[in-house]
Swiss-Prot record:
Catalytic activity of the protein: 2-C-methyl-D-erythritol 4-phosphate + CTP + H(+) = 4-CDP-2-C-methyl-D-erythritol + diphosphate
The species this protein was found in: Pseudomonas aeruginosa (strain UCBPP-PA14)
A Pfam cross-reference name: IspD
Involved pathway(s): Isoprenoid biosynthesis; isopentenyl diphosphate biosynthesis via DXP pathway; isopentenyl diphosphate from 1-deoxy-D-xylulose 5-phosphate: step 2/6
The organism's taxonomic lineage, starting at the top: Bacteria, Pseudomonadati, Pseudomonadota, Gammaproteobacteria, Pseudomonadales
EC numbers: 2.7.7.60
GO MF, one annotated term: 2-C-methyl-D-erythritol 4-phosphate cytidylyltransferase activity
Family label: Belongs to the IspD/TarI cytidylyltransferase family. IspD subfamily.
Keyword Lipid metabolism listed: no
Top EC class of this enzyme: transferase
GO biological process annotation, one example: isopentenyl diphosphate biosynthetic process, methylerythritol 4-phosphate pathway
Site (Positions MEP for the nucleophilic attack): 162, 218
Full protein name: 2-C-methyl-D-erythritol 4-phosphate cytidylyltransferase
Length: 234
């Protein structure tokens, strides 16, 4: 499948979190990564893709860092109000897409603001494998280490079969209307939603797992940032 055969898509980037585990003076998406902020590098892969229709970044109220970035002035990038939880931010982003002319059956890719090492190859693979899928899915990586379940005392209660375990990454790709309904209904029901796929699962869907690169890391700790520094030219 050539690039022109890939489906057009919209992107939502929830970026209202503070990243307290980084112990930094600013949210982790605004930390320096080889001379540019993390979020700028995160957006690059999407803004350089010819099938992108538009991108919405969901920001905290009075975010002082975003306005000073070059990408904030891009005609492809719009803002939406971030929420208390990830699901709230994504819902806000989906509503903004509808205001921009997106349709309920359009594809939307939701991606972590602090996951800056997404490759064009992984993005194209996700788009190609899900282009005709009735549900959608997500990039994921098969578990490679032995997995243990712990009891309340921190002791091993069982060994889990890793052949059926995958690590959920992003982007996660679903139809706008279906994802909006799943997130909204889950929030009303008080269901704990950790990512978009979990909302779709709760709504009765079975998202498809698309294998991606293990180095598509989400920055959570200072060690993660240090590891990714080596991936980008200075």
């Amino acid at each position: 499948m050539t690039t022109s055969d890939l489906p057009a898509f919209w992107t939502v980037i929830p970026a209202a979190g503070v990243g307290s585990r980084m112990r930094a003076d600013r949210p982790k998406q605004y930390l320096d990564l080889a001379g540019r902020t993390v979020i700028e590098r995160t957006l690059d892969c999407f803004l350089e893709h010819p099938m992108l229709r538009g991108l919405v970044v969901c920001l905290a109220e009075d975010d002082p860092y975003w306005p000073g970035l070059d990408c904030a002035a891009s005609r492809h990038v719009q803002r939406a109000a971030g929420g208390v939880e990830r699901a709230d931010s994504v819902l806000s982003g989906l509503l903004r897409l509808l205001e921009l002319g997106a349709q309920a059956d359009d594809w939307v890719l939701v991606h972590d603001a602090a996951r800056p090492n997404l490759t064009r190859g992984d993005l194209d693979r996700l788009l190609e494998e899900l282009a005709e899928d009735p549900v959608g899915g997500l990039l994921a990586v098969p578990a490679r280490d032995t997995l243990k379940r712990a009891d309340r005392d921190g002791r091993v209660s069982e060994t889990i079969d890793r052949s059926v375990v995958w690590l959920a990454y992003t982007p996660q790709m679903f139809r706008l209307g279906a994802l909006h309904r799943a997130l909204a209904d889950a929030l009303v029901a008080g269901v704990a939603i950790t990512d978009e796929a979990s909302a779709m699962e709760w709504a009765g869907y079975a998202p498809k797992l698309v294998e991606g690169r293990a180095d598509n890391l989400k920055i959570t700790t200072p060690e993660d940032l240090l590891r990714l520094q080596r991936s980008f030219p200075h």
